[in-house]
């Protein structure tokens, strides 16, 4: 097929229509839609509830585990246990951690009751956010949740889909 502007427009319209129907296709496949916001720092902010308590989180595909700061122990009623694992990320390494197992996580209408959380000092994350006047977060929703929920991120429409 010879390439011309008509073919380019047709290809664009075809892919746009496919994206437009994405929500309907995923809904039929039992995916739940969760909206997120993009901050000035290009982080994806998402609202979640842990053990029935609401919080603000960064959605981070590069974080292997979901985590909360130490203040989250009381806030989310976590049963924290000491851990030998050291955390690293966002410019900090070798940080002391604790673990909290079998927590309930709810992201809009999607939920799980077996979420293990890493607990560590998130002050470096929130300090970086505050430099851009972005509100602090309670934690990070990581790849563990995305994998468990077979996550699909629609960056254009600011939606996460979980099954």
Which residues fall in each region the model found?
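Cationic, low-complexity basic patches in intrinsically disordered or flexible, solvent-exposed regions
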Residues: 3
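Pepsin/retropepsin-fold aspartyl endopeptidases
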Residues: 6-163
């Amino acid at each position: 097929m010879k390439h011309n502007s008509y073919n380019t427009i047709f290809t664009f319209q075809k892919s746009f229509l496919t994206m437009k129907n994405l929500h309907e296709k995923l809904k039929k496949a039992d995916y739940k839609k969760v909206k997120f916001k993009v901050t000035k720092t290009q982080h994806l902010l998402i609202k979640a509830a842990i053990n029935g308590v609401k919080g603000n989180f960064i959605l981070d595909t590069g974080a292997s585990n979901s985590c909360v700061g130490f203040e989250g122990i009381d806030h989310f009623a976590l049963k924290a246990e000491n851990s030998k694992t050291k955390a690293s990320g966002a410019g900090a390494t070798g940080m002391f951690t604790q673990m909290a197992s079998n927590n309930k996580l709810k992201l809009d209408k999607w939920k799980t009751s077996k979420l293990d959380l890493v607990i560590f000092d998130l002050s470096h994350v929130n300090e970086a956010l505050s430099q851009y006047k972005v509100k602090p977060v309670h934690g990070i929703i990581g790849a563990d949740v995305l994998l468990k929920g077979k996550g699909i991120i629609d960056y254009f429409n600011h939606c996460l889909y979980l099954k």
